[in-house]
Amino acid sequence: SSDDETEVKHAVAQVTDVIDAFPAWYADALLQVQRAKLGLQTEQAEDASLADAFLALLQQHQVDFTQAWRRLADAAAGDANPLRALFAESTAINPWLLQWQARCAAEDDADPQAATARAVRAVRLRQTNPRIIPRNHRVEEALAAASAHGDLSLFNRLLAALQQPFSDDPAWA
């Protein structure tokens, strides 16, 4: 009947509106996460390109993303060498670092508590960017031990480590 067709058209229009809105919603949500991972609290137009450039640099130089995000905290605290050390060519990150540092400084300078803002950025970064993630080889080792030998000890240690992803236990990085 025409009522059914009208309902279907209306439902399709509603779903289409939601689907059409999704890319913008997703991009905005992703940018909010990236700002946090970069240690930024305010919104600036260049933030998406800053995050994209960092990710492209990591990919181009085959740098471990998790470690790089984590070592931004060291850079925020004034020592970019741990981040640079992840790159085969340690100076490759320098142009991006200058942009990120300028962006952080602009945010800090706008804050009447700028000294506090600088001091807490590294802490925020360490609370946002995990050090421990479920790396494939670690999960496979735990699964192999459990399935081949019924040994859950490695699984239990991995699970315990993953329950504290922001700790600095280098055994699980």
Predicted regions and their residues:
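Regulatory N- and C-terminal appendages and interdomain linkers associated
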Residues: 2-173
